Amino acid sequence: MPSIRLADLAQQLDAELHGDGDIVITGVASMQSAQTGHITFMVNPKYREHLGLCQASAVVMTQDDLPFAKSAALVVKNPYLTYARMAQILDTTPKPAQNIAPSAVIDETAKLGNNVSIGANAVIESGVELGDNVIIGAGCFVGKNSKIGAGSRLWANVTIYHEIQIGQNCLIQSGTVVGADGFGYANDRGNWVKIPQIGRVIIGDRVEIGACTTIDRGALDDTVIGNGVIIDNQCQIAHNVVIGDNTAVAGGVIMAGSLKIGRYCMIGGASVINGHMEICDKVTVTGMGMVMRPITEPGVYSSGIPLQPNKVWRKTAALVMNIDDMSKRLKSLERKVNQQD
């Protein structure tokens, strides 16, 4: 279990220490579950009333909240960002063994950097290049001529097809498939003719991809995931999609082929986005959004009807179904009124 003196933690976080710097911190916890040795954080003033009951040894908070502190405190401008950084310092995620498992199958032409770890039953095909400190989990497959940059990690059972490029310090969770064929077919009098997908997938640096996500290779041009992109679980990214730097994609999102998304966008969970169009920089699509047309102006966009009691929803649905008829009737009434005037 990691541990650190509160004073040392404050220094690493560039935080202002209030209280005993010799307190030993052994973990991060929520305000409700924290015990002695834990550090917690408060991001909303409405939780001030809970400080009296909180058992944490220290709390991260803003200057405005400091008068309400009942324990040692670290004062910062952004408690949530500080929480992320101290969680990294006190991370308890298991570290892989620094070795290559005897059951791993590695082609003799593969190039391995320094301190590479490869788990049991992993397969590394010919021409693969793994940078320094790369971690390949048990059961992974890395296809011919693919490249994985230094410091990147594949958790167990990740599949990387041939000719894929993954940048430095990336993280890919279990069950994800990168580089499978895109959904490309031509129709010959009712019969589907497969179009070989000869593009690649290019993934930038510091990209994180959740579990069981699929990113298809390009048909001709490449599918591209920019630097700093984060993608949640169970997303489908079709062939030739381009996602700009530092965009965030929540779980269950489906992106159709040849879509281009700008930088610093946020795509809410279960959204569906049409292909062959562009979304500009700094766009937020709220959850379950259905994006059928290009978005050319930054901002927040929503679609759909939020949850309602069933009886209310049925009335709403009936109104929506009849809105065209209602519009025609309204225009007819307007014409009659205008004629009377």
UniProtKB/Swiss-Prot annotation:
Its annotated pathway reads: Glycolipid biosynthesis; lipid IV(A) biosynthesis; lipid IV(A) from (3R)-3-hydroxytetradecanoyl-[acyl-carrier-protein] and UDP-N-acetyl-alpha-D-glucosamine: step 3/6
CC per GO annotation = membrane
Provide the family line.
Belongs to the transferase hexapeptide repeat family. LpxD subfamily.
Among InterPro entries, the record links this protein to:
Hexapep, Hexapep_transf_CS, LpxD, Trimer_LpxA-like_sf, UDP_GlcNAc_AcTrfase_non-rep
Instruction: Please give the subunit comment from the record.
Output: Homotrimer.
Which biological processes are named by the entry's GO terms? lipid A biosynthetic process
- Write the protein's name: UDP-3-O-(3-hydroxymyristoyl)glucosamine N-acyltransferase
Q: Which residues form a coiled coil?
A: none
The GO terms describing molecular function are: N-acyltransferase activity; UDP-3-O-(R-3-hydroxymyristoyl)-glucosamine N-acyltransferase activity
> Into which EC class is this enzyme placed?
transferase
Pfam families membership: Hexapep, LpxD
User: Which reaction equation describes what this protein catalyses?
Assistant: a UDP-3-O-[(3R)-3-hydroxyacyl]-alpha-D-glucosamine + a (3R)-hydroxyacyl-[ACP] = a UDP-2-N,3-O-bis[(3R)-3-hydroxyacyl]-alpha-D-glucosamine + holo-[ACP] + H(+); UDP-3-O-[(3R)-3-hydroxytetradecanoyl]-alpha-D-glucosamine + (3R)-hydroxytetradecanoyl-[ACP] = UDP-2-N,3-O-bis[(3R)-3-hydroxytetradecanoyl]-alpha-D-glucosamine + holo-[ACP] + H(+)
Q: What is its EC number?
A: 2.3.1.191
